[in-house]
Structure formats: structure tokens, C-alpha cells
């Protein structure tokens, strides 16, 4: 028989084993875990079992181990992080196997609920498009420049464009088409399309296209005939049905902003029945929130204003709000009445240019914009902060 000392030794060993087992459960794979996979290539791994913010953190922490054995990552396209992440996310999208539950969207945001947040300056993120989707941001944007009358490059400043790798098709429309094809492979119903959010496939992603070049007519032509054509042909873009006089919602809703064309003659390509003569208009205008007219209920799905313009309209100043640390009751009442007017036209609203520093001011104003004013899209650069405010 075992003595007291022997029993204690066995008991202690058992406790240590149990503690080790439970400590490994519920945690994300670590660098130590990946040391066991040094000889494996990321191209041999289909699913890490992580989504959303946890997936982003995992890739950032383990990037060296995820890419060091892959020769193709020696020459970057966007960045090492982006290239490796995109390779992992879109791997199954190129296969012929139809399995939406193991799709890119499942990897990105399974168990992540869509949030009413606009991914401001999304193209500046380390993972354009993908980071916003991983957080569940229901709106994104891309600034586009017309290069050589045939390429739409994405970027904020014309001096720092890359018309080879940082283009609208490579960063946005191409990946969108791939991931939407994955989750719509089983459904032949033309009137039913699954979107980019696993937990809410009926939610449409607002996609703002900010026109930067002077020739907005040519930019629009490139959008319709080149960059959005495959998404249109696949039934993935929201459109205004001219015959039924109603908006038909689809997985992606394109909103034109910035220096966009406003003439219906341009928007409909000189036709009475739409750009492609299908009685459909596939792009909506970013309506001016401070000067709305009834016509925008058909031309738009959202209205926008800057925070400074809104405060000025309400007889105040954004600096006063910043110094005070919050909007007062008069400012809230005025701004809310304007947003209510947009809602009466069935338009969503977005307020951009709110204070970005310090953090406590950003949080206070953001909460007021969403909860007190009733605005629909929180316009923030920091998606982590945004997720905690909704």
C-alpha cells in the first residue's frame, strides 16, 4: 500500500496535470504552439478556429512563424501581414468545394455581430476591407483616383498611389466577389443573396466610393463597366428598381461621395431605363444632410454631414463642444431634429469629423452621436474603441 507521502505525491501530480489541461483550454494558440509547426506552411492550414478580433491578434503575434517557410512571401504585394492574411482568408474561395460554413466570411466574423460603424479611411488599415469585416463594421470606404484613364487606384493622397497593387479591384471588389461567391454557391434563388456577415447574412455592407479625380464621369464609367460589373452580374449590388420605384437590397450597397457626378444623365448613361438599360440604378448618392430634398429618397440610402458643419448649423461651434467635453441640450435637440428629418426620408445618417482626441472626449461625443442624436453610423478610425461604444 502507498504511504501518506506516496498518496500526496500522486495527488499533487494529478492536480498539476488537471491545471495544465484547463489552462490550455480557452486560450488562443501561442508562439510556443507554433514552434511545433515550424516545418508547416500556412498554405497547409485551412482554419485556425479563430474569428474577429482574436484572429487579427493571433496573426499579428505569430506572423513570423506563419510566413517564414513560404518563399512566395519574400516579395510583398501590399505588406507581409496583408499578403499572409489574405492568403489564409481566401484559400477556400478558389476551390470548387461549396461549404459556406468554412468560408472566408466564417473565418472573418463568425460569432461577431454587425455593428453600425463606418470604417473611416479603411484603406489606411493594415488589412483593408478584412479588418473592418472582422470587427463587424457595416460600412467601409475607399478613396479612388483615376490613373491613365483606366485604373482606379486607392489612396488618400495622389502623391502616394500604387496603381499596381493598391487598386480598387485588388483591395476591395475582387475579394468581395470571391467571398460572396463562397456563401452563395448553394442558393440559385436570384432574389436571395447572402452577405458578408456570418451572423447576419441579410445585412448589406455600405461601400462608400470617394471620388478624388477631377474627371468624375470617367471614374463613374470605370466603376460601372469594369470594377463593379462582376458584382452586378452576380446580383450582389443593391439597386433602385425604376419600374417598381423601390430599393432592392443586396449584400453590398454602393454610395458615391466626394467629387461624384450628380447628373442623372451620367448616372444612367444617357438612358431612361438605367446605365445598362435594365431599369436598375446600382449606385446611390451621399445625400447632404443639411439640405435634404424629397428626391433623395430615391437617389440615396444615406445622408452625411461633418460635425463642424452640424454644430455651426445649430448655432454653435465644434471647438466649444470640445472644450465643454460634450454637446449640450440645445445642440442635441437641434442636431436630432435634422437626423429625424433624414429618417423621415428613410435615409441612414453619418456624421464625420467629430473630435478624435483625447480618448474620453471621443467616447463621450461618439455615445451622444449614436444614442442621443440617433445617428445610424458611427464614423471612427479606431474599430476597437467603436466596438466598445455600440
UniProtKB/Swiss-Prot annotation:
Consequence of gene loss (knockout): Impairs respiratory growth.
Xref: CDD domains: PI-PLCc_GDPD_SF_unchar3 (cd08577)
SUPFAM superfamilies hit by this protein: PLC-like phosphodiesterases
Keyword Thylakoid: no
Cleavable signal peptide: 1-17
GO molecular function: phosphoric diester hydrolase activity
Gene Ontology biological-process entries: lipid metabolic process
Keyword terms, alphabetized: Signal
Homology family: Belongs to the AIM6 family.
Protein name: Altered inheritance of mitochondria protein 6
Source organism per UniProt: Saccharomyces cerevisiae (strain ATCC 204508 / S288c) (Baker's yeast)
Classification of source organism: Eukaryota, Fungi, Dikarya, Ascomycota, Saccharomycotina
Amino acid at each position: 500500500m502507498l504511504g501518506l507521502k506516496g498518496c500526496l505525491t500522486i495527488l499533487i501530480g494529478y492536480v498539476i496535470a488537471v491545471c495544465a489541461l484547463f489552462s490550455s483550454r480557452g486560450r488562443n494558440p501561442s508562439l510556443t504552439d507554433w514552434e511545433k509547426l515550424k516545418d508547416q506552411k500556412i498554405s497547409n492550414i485551412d482554419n485556425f478556429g479563430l474569428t474577429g478580433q482574436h484572429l487579427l491578434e493571433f496573426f499579428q503575434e505569430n506572423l513570423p512563424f506563419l510566413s517564414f517557410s513560404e518563399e512566395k512571401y519574400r516579395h510583398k504585394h501590399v505588406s507581409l501581414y496583408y499578403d499572409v492574411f489574405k492568403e489564409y482568408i481566401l484559400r477556400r474561395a478558389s476551390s470548387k468545394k461549396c461549404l459556406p460554413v468554412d468560408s472566408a466570411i466564417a473565418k472573418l466574423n463568425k460569432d461577431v455581430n454587425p455593428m453600425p460603424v463606418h470604417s473611416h479611411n479603411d484603406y489606411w488599415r493594415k488589412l483593408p476591407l478584412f479588418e473592418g469585416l472582422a470587427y463587424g463594421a457595416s460600412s467601409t470606404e475607399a478613396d479612388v483616383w483615376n490613373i491613365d484613364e483606366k485604373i482606379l487606384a486607392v489612396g488618400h493622397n495622389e502623391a502616394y498611389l500604387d496603381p499596381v497593387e493598391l487598386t480598387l479591384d485588388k483591395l476591395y471588389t475582387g475579394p468581395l466577389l470571391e467571398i460572396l461567391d463562397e456563401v452563395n454557391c448553394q442558393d440559385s434563388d436570384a432574389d436571395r443573396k447572402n452577405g458578408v456577415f456570418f451572423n447576419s447574412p441579410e445585412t448589406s455592407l455600405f461601400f462608400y466610393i470617394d471620388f478624388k479625380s477631377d474627371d468624375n464621369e470617367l471614374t463613374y464609367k470605370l466603376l460601372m463597366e469594369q470594377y463593379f460589373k462582376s458584382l452586378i452580374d452576380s446580383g450582389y449590388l443593391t439597386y433602385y428598381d425604376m419600374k417598381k420605384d423601390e430599393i432592392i437590397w443586396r449584400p453590398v450597397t454602393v454610395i458615391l461621395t466626394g467629387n461624384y457626378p450628380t447628373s442623372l444623365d451620367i448616372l444612367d448613361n444617357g438612358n431612361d431605363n438605367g446605365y445598362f438599360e435594365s431599369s436598375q440604378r446600382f449606385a446611390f448618392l451621399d445625400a447632404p444632410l443639411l439640405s435634404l430634398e424629397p428626391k433623395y429618397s430615391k437617389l440615396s440610402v444615406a445622408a452625411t454631414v461633418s460635425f463642424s458643419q452640424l454644430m455651426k448649423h445649430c448655432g454653435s461651434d465644434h471647438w466649444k463642444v470640445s472644450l465643454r467635453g460634450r454637446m449640450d441640450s440645445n445642440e442635441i435637440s437641434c442636431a436630432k431634429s435634422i437626423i429625424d428629418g433624414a429618417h423621415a426620408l428613410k435615409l441612414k445618417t453619418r456624421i464625420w469629423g467629430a473630435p478624435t482626441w483625447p480618448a474620453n472626449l471621443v467616447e463621450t461625443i461618439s455615445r451622444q452621436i449614436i444614442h442621443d442624436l440617433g445617428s445610424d453610423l458611427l464614423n471612427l478610425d479606431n474599430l476597437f474603441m467603436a466596438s466598445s461604444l455600440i
